[in-house]
Amino acid sequence: MENVTLSPDGKSVVIIDQTKLPNAIEYLTLSTSRQMYDAIFALKVRGAPAIGICAGFSIYCLAQTIEETEYDAFLLKFREYKDYLDSSRPTAVNLSWALKRMGKVVLDAKDKSIDEILSLLKAECIAIKEEDIKICKAISEYGLEFLKDGDGILTHCNAGPLATSQYGTALGPLILGKERGMNFKVFADETRPLLQGARLTAFELHEAGIDVTLICDNMASIVMKNGFINACFVGCDRVAENGDTANKIGTSGVAILAKHYGIPFYVMCPTSTIDLNCKTGDDIEIELRSEDEIKSKWYEKPMAPSDVKCYNPAFDVTDHNLITAIITEHGVCKAPFEVSLREAVKKAEDIINK
């Protein structure tokens, strides 16, 4: 079940509409810049790596529609599309990372024909997805080192195959362990207000044959206190240089509880999610979303007075002091994060620049 791919003719992006899960598996074909923007903004495609993959495919498809045959005019229109897609969601760094990577292809090909540039763009967006498959497998292998057969794991939001291209990040070690005969007891936070834990994580783990129990977000403390949890596994959307980590709203609360109960808290992400230009979590822009997601989205009738104000940040920042380790495809990063994260990013850059 591929969640993000190119259409057979390479002119459109095909995604699973994650807003319809788990009740229906519906595929959407994205052919225009507006459709692509809306798919990312409305969370029809979500998860930092999956957003990056979708952005890479999208900008390639849009580049094919540019009618300009002269390089400078082509570049100008390409940048318009790139900036438009980049504005869809501000917190997940993989979006801008993928678009910058595609943009570099165009900048480095000034002396080539437009047809040659399009061929290079196609190769690059396909490479982004193929690399993500290998990255998720590597993260899963490293993460599995921190698991024992029978462990109880708490998750928040969704960082499984739907959020990436295969295996996932935070769910990857669990799925890989299951493939190798291990068993786990996973407690999945429902993850209000958009219920990614209920709709997506519980769905993926159940499909994988993993023992999963869905809980409300405000039940995280009691399952920890009861001794049900051996570790917390989460993904993330951006990591600052000092190790502060932006992830789905509610993640920082889970980390604080884990610290209180002496439970290790692991963050799993590709190095593309690490933003060394962002010094601390204070520098991460937090996306604010519609009040309707809280008051009315999941109900036949609104569950609050229509004129009641709502505060709906999509993400919060987990302080680096609460994080046991950040697990990447190039190894396990521990404090001091300024050193270990930079080393992981350098390994990734060295491979790309070979």
From Swiss-Prot:
Quote the SUPFAM superfamilies the UniProt record gives.
NagB/RpiA/CoA transferase-like
**Catalytic residues (positions):** D237
Q: Which UniProt keywords apply?
A: Carbohydrate metabolism, Isomerase
> What is the native source organism of this protein?
Lachnoclostridium phytofermentans (strain ATCC 700394 / DSM 18823 / ISDg)
NCBIfam families xrefs? eIF-2B_rel (TIGR00524), PRK05720.1 (NF004326), salvage_mtnA (TIGR00512)
**Site (Transition state stabilizer) residue list:** C157
Record's function text: Catalyzes the isomerization of 5-deoxy-alpha-D-ribose 1-phosphate to 5-deoxy-D-ribulose 1-phosphate, as part of a 5-deoxyribose salvage pathway that recycles this toxic radical SAM enzyme by-product to mainstream metabolites.
Q: According to its UniProt record, which protein family does this protein belong to? A: Belongs to the EIF-2B alpha/beta/delta subunits family. DrdI subfamily.
Q: Kindly give the InterPro entries that the UniProt entry links to this protein.
A: Deoxyribose1P_isomerase_DrdI (IPR043679), IF-2B-related (IPR000649), IF-M1Pi (IPR005251), IF_2B-like_C (IPR042529), Initiation_fac_2B_a/b/d (IPR011559), M1Pi_N (IPR027363), NagB/RpiA_transferase-like (IPR037171)
Q: What class of enzyme is it?
A: isomerase
- Stated name of the protein: 5-deoxyribose 1-phosphate isomerase
Binding, substrate: R46, G47, A48, R89, Q196, N247, K248
Q: What's a Gene Ontology MF term here?
A: S-methyl-5-thioribose-1-phosphate isomerase activity
Q: Which GO terms describe its biological process?
A: L-methionine salvage from methylthioadenosine; pentose catabolic process
Q: Which Gene3D superfamilies match?
A: translation initiation factor eif-2b, domain 1 (1.20.120.420), Translation initiation factor eif-2b, domain 2 (3.40.50.10470)
